[in-house]
A protein has these predicted regions:
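Active-site helix of classical SDR
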Residues: 22
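Catalytic tyrosine of NAD(P)H-dependent dehydrogenase/reductases that use a Tyr as the general acid/base
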Residues: 19, 27
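A transmembrane-helix-recognition feature enriched in membrane-embedded lipid enzymes
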Residues: 122-158, 163
Length: 176
């Protein structure tokens, strides 16, 4: 049995209470089930993916909690200001979703990591260096991990040079 939570079942960010509650519920359910099924032949795993290159940001229906909306100035961030790329150009909601997807780990690679974790009978399967680093920062700094999250994410990119290159290319990519 493989249940998928998220790194957001380990850490929390402001204004995402319902999402975190659902991911923590999957985590709690799975960890409890692992204890209940000890001694049986049933393998139970909980997957904690980090940033995987899926269409979640394109297909998601964002509310005011995540994005304040889109107007003639482009997609607005939490501060109410338009989100811009490294060239200072405004980014649409669709373009932001595409860039988010394209900067993530290849889903096939994520699947291989999950299958390897299942074969090794790992109860917790963290997918991606970002997921592992965020989980570690939460354990080491439970009250202040959000303050160091930018550093954690940057370190994740440094340990994954191909993703760092993708992120830089996407950040400076000119909209066609």
């Amino acid at each position: 049995l493989v249940n998928t939570s998220s790194i957001f079942g380990i850490i929390t960010t402001p204004n995402n209470t319902v999402y975190h509650a659902s991911k923590f519920a999957v985590r709690g359910f799975t960890e409890s089930l692992i204890k209940e099924m000890e001694g049986s032949n049933t393998q139970i795993h909980c997957v904690y993916p980090g940033h995987i290159g899926t269409n979640i940001a394109i297909n998601a229906k964002f509310g005011d909690q995540i994005v304040k909306g889109e107007n003639k100035d482009g997609i607005l961030g939490l501060d109410g200001e338009p989100i811009k790329d490294l060239k200072g150009e405004k980014v649409s909601e669709e373009e932001a979703g595409v860039r988010f997807r394209d900067a993530g780990m290849d889903p096939d690679k994520a699947a291989k990591i999950i299958l390897r974790g299942i074969k090794k009978n790992k109860k917790r399967i963290f997918v991606g260096i970002d997921s592992k680093l965020m989980e570690l920062s939460q354990r080491l700094f439970p009250d202040s991990y959000l303050k160091i999250m930018p550093i954690t994410l940057f370190l994740g990119l440094l340990f994954s040079p191909h993703r760092l290159k993708k992120v830089i290319n996407l950040a400076i990519k000119k909209k066609a």
